[in-house]
Amino acid sequence: MVKQKKETLAVAWCDNGMVDGKFMEGVVDTLINSGVEFCGSLRAHGNQIAQQRETLVNRWYDNNKSDWLLWLDSDIMITPEKFLKLWNRRDAVDVPLLTGVYFTSDQPEQPLMRPLATVYEFAELPEGIGIRRLDPLPKNTFLKVSAAGMGFCLMHRSVITRIKEALPGVPFFAEVGANKQFTGEDIYFFAVVNKAEIPLWCDTAATVGHMKRFNMGEDYYDAFGRGKGYAGLS
């Protein structure tokens, strides 16, 4: 009987010089307790996110021989349990690229920010091709999507190989356009993935926390019934 090779993983993130302690706690916990064979971490420091990601993916592909790369944002709160939801869904052939779910808001630093999942479908807009969020988000569902944030994304090495073959010389990450036509580096990457005909899968049960600032004011207090709303949580 031929012994099957154990697949390996590296983890990558970008930061501006500092990371949240909850992020690092989650990474260490996952490295130690997930039971997966890790082959190192990759970090890019700076403020040009597209350039940082491009540097990381090339460094990983050229120098790190792990089968899979886990992309994390440096303010994500990962756990071994949530990571394993993605890891156990992976398949180098059929599911080479998959994302979990974290939440952002179009109203940063407001007292009652509406949380929205960073999972998208491509859509035609008046100003051209754009994206729309998957909202409401279906619970405990494994489905194909068009794009996502890069904050909790698992990628097989073959994804980069296939992009190189289908679109030689094209950067993996770039920021293009301006104003309403601006496309961030993460959506650009998934547009490239889509053009290379690589599917992106999403497990909506693999949700992780996202450390963000918000204004904890009276509106927030009122949302919990002037303090009474916590009674049902105890």
PLM region descriptions:
Residues 1-47, 51:
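N-proximal low-complexity "stem/linker" segments adjacent to membrane-targeting elements
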Residues 2-5, 163-234:
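C-terminal catalytic/acceptor-binding lobe
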Residues 13-14, 46, 75, 87-89, ...:
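Polar low-complexity intrinsically disordered regions
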Residues 32-35, 91, 194:
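Anion (oxyanion) recognition and catalysis
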Residues 39, 67-69, 96:
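Conserved acidic residues
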Residues 54-68:
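Active-site nucleotide-sugar/metal-binding loop of Leloir-type enzymes
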Residues 57, 79-174:
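Conserved catalytic core of nucleotide-sugar-dependent glycosyltransferases
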Residues 65-77:
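Short beta-strand-to-loop acidic/aromatic patch adjacent to the donor-nucleotide binding site
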